[in-house]
């Protein structure tokens, strides 16, 4: 393959390599994705997102984790896709529809100086709480809210939520003191999660204010996870720890999440372009 043009972008530290595939059907093997995502020998990222044409929406995001595995969707990633298509002149709409592996999502662009996108609000749709649809191998189809399971000798309470991708939300006393990198991969690959799972460790900082660390399926600990923040908001409300409008601090920045009366979850946060370049793959 000739030199591959790319743009690196980040949403509160959740960084991906974005490849404009609207003019050519560009595809990479899992090994190539691993190579360019490597932080020592490649560009360095949490994964790769291809921006493609869509028959269902205005554009499609085709997402892969840094280990080369595919993923349905990324909340921070979709904000960056929205910024890319507007800032690079692929659309002049401030409300484009973007197809993801979790369905077509509507975004609302907040334009700043230089006619560039600063913030993006995304209607993330309704949370899924039915165990078999998350999926979780569970004893019944009742929502899994504050249920206990054992991992590495610890009894942990978790709430299971899908925002188009699966999340296990666990509230702990102090995220920074919790062994996220030790426990996270054990939960990710626990047999009750047949497609593996993203894990959120959450500490209550105040009224409707959480601090979140995320162990992402296929990527390890990341600085942020937008779908995870949405799942945390839902779990916080279902467990009586918060209302439906929540401020969530992550290691890379802050997101505002609202679980609306319609049942949809609205996520608002920044999106930034870091640099563009070419790489041999």
UniProtKB/Swiss-Prot annotation:
Provide the protein's localization: Cytoplasm
The regions listed as transmembrane in this protein's record are none
- GO cellular component terms, A-Z: cytosol
| Pfam families the record matches | DAP_epimerase (PF01678)
* Keyword Transferase tagged: no
What Gene3D superfamilies is this protein classified in? Answer: Diaminopimelate Epimerase, Chain A, domain 1
Q: Which residues form the active site?
A: 74, 225
Any one GO MF term held by the record is:
diaminopimelate epimerase activity
Disulphide bonds annotated for this chain are none
InterPro entries xref list: DAP_epimerase_AS, DAP_epimerase_DapF
Which pathway, per its entry?
Amino-acid biosynthesis; L-lysine biosynthesis via DAP pathway; DL-2,6-diaminopimelate from LL-2,6-diaminopimelate: step 1/1
Asked if the keyword Electron transport belongs to this entry, the reply reads: no
Q: What is its EC number?
A: 5.1.1.7
Query: Which parts of the sequence are marked as the site Could be important to modulate the pK values of the two catalytic cysteine residues?
Result: 167, 216
- A GO biological process this protein is involved in? lysine biosynthetic process via diaminopimelate
**Subunit arrangement?**
Homodimer.
Member of which family?
Belongs to the diaminopimelate epimerase family.
> Mind telling me which HAMAP family this protein's record contains?
DAP_epimerase
Q: What does this protein do?
A: Catalyzes the stereoinversion of LL-2,6-diaminopimelate (L,L-DAP) to meso-diaminopimelate (meso-DAP), a precursor of L-lysine and an essential component of the bacterial peptidoglycan.
Descriptive protein name = Diaminopimelate epimerase
Q: Which organism is it from?
A: Leptospira borgpetersenii serovar Hardjo-bovis (strain JB197)
Its lineage reads: Bacteria, Pseudomonadati, Spirochaetota, Spirochaetia, Leptospirales
